[in-house]
Amino acid sequence: MQALKKQSLTRDGLEFVRDEPEPRVGHGDVKIRVEAASICGTDQSIYHIIDRPGMRDEMLVYNGGDVSRYQPIIIGHEFCGEVAEVGEDVDQGLCRPGDYVTAEMHISCGFCQQCRTGQRHICRNIRVKGVHMDGAFAEFVVVPSDNVINLERFGGRDVIPPRIGAFLDALGNSVHTVMEGNVAGKTVAILGCGAQGLMATAVARTLGATRIYVTDFSGKEGAARLANRFETAKELGADFCFDTNETASPRQKDELLERVGTERGGGVDVVLEMSGAEAAYNDAGAMVKNGGQILLLGIPAWPLKSFDFGKYAVWKGVTIRGIFGRRMFETWYAMLDLLASEKSGLKARLEKIIAREAVPLSDFERGFELVRKQEAVKLLLTP
């Protein structure tokens, strides 16, 4: 079968292969024919592994940290497809061949304290398909039956088409983050205007945030490129957008802090940090009101050195919470119900961030480049 593999953690790039053996189905597994998959930031980090030592170390967690023992894997963890085969122990009420499905690609152990107390999303022994074991950038992927999400129960392709079904994993991160903030009737700041930040903007607007501030740092690409992202953010529901690069956009950061300071409470109720940029953490502390919440989904490329906990957490009485993955499976049900509801408007908002053209898996270099250049937010790959 066709597949996209990471062959080595000592060099950048990926390799497209045509002769990868199809995965075998275990007794409790489901084999899925991939219909569409989506490129995410994790995939980009795996592609550019030399500049992402944290990602390299994470991929080595399950073989003792020895790069010489690394086994090439198929990457990719956002996808949807059709059930091709089920193991003999799989309950037919869960799924059958031909069903339209996706899957939770975080594989939990089931026996640690977290798993046994309803917190499987932060399992101590978690493994991620496409990072630690073969993933979905291929014609077929095998997942444990417990992780299968049967989309037929939410209206199937008519309600959740593959162009959205392919990135439910990523959307779930944003839904989890926004829901932890209980944003209805609250002011919200979203730091980072990448895919996660834009999806969080759409979800926050859907769930009733009263005012939404979106920020990002224009970086080398310049303010003009970021301006396009800000236009998209406003289409998704943002009220205000600010470039925090004080060199490229003088006075915008000052204006942001002045405007946020006029909010009731002297800051926003909830900050969603979606970028992982070190500077954004202090921005979050400056923007949140006393007694507010900071929710962290973005993962820094390097250990943080400069967050002022005394000033921004202790003295403000702020609650800071890390967000990882999706609650299994509360986040999934909430997300799918929102998508299935025409009244929510979430599906229509998300259509604004999906590239019109799907890219064949064999042409993956072009797809990754489009995402890297921010010419696409969510781009689909098809085997």
PLM feature spans:
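Glycine-centered, small-residue-biased loops immediately flanking beta-strands
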Residues: G292-Q293, V318
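C-terminal hydrophobic helical "lid"/dimerization subdomain
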Residues: N282-A286, F329-P383
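Glycine-rich Rossmann-fold phosphate-binding loop(s) that bind the pyrophosphate
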Residues: A170, G192-Q196, I299
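Rossmann-fold NAD(P)-binding glycine/threonine-rich loop
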Residues: I299-G317, M335
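Glycine-rich beta-strand-centered segment in the early N-terminal region that forms part
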Residues: P23-A37, R52-Q113, F154-G155
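Hydrophobic/small residue at the entry helix of a nucleotide-binding pocket
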Residues: N173, Q196, A204
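Adenosine-nucleotide cofactor-binding segment
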Residues: R205-Y281
